[in-house]
């Protein structure tokens, strides 16, 4: 089922925004075809972290991830960062050859920074290019702000939900902003 035109969408939830001091606590992937039709959802993985690591989260992350149940899932998880990387690669290898898909998502450069430091084999699986939906969001906000009114994100800050939102948002921009 591998197709070099398929797109890999990824989202990470982290303990904060600093890849040198914060860590990945959840990850999910979705593979779409080039027309944004979902082909498969990968594993949704809560990555185990110690209570000591979780205690270093700032107020926003503590409230957000605690309220969504993610912090508890991370505590209960037995999956290490290395195992999460392995499971995700195992899934992706079924759908996209190495080096063919850009890394796809929202503000994806931030996710890529964490992958580079904490999951380098997974980061290297992607093409060097990024498909960042937030680029279109920024352009639409400046060039056609009325388009922004037609799309609302769920905002759960759970990895799989965030990817679904990103794909839906790109579909929205394709229909209302990009003239093809």
UniProtKB/Swiss-Prot annotation:
The keyword GTP-binding does not apply. This is Oligoribonuclease. It comes from Stutzerimonas stutzeri (strain A1501). InterPro entries: Exonuclease_RNaseT/DNA_pol3 (IPR013520), Oligoribonuclease (IPR022894), RNaseH-like_sf (IPR012337), RNaseH_sf (IPR036397). It comes from the Bacteria. Keywords: Cytoplasm, Exonuclease, Hydrolase, Nuclease. It is found in: Cytoplasm. Belongs to the oligoribonuclease family. NCBIfam families: PRK05359.1 (NF003765). The active site is at 128. One of its GO terms (molecular function) is 3'-5'-RNA exonuclease activity. The keyword Cytoplasm applies.
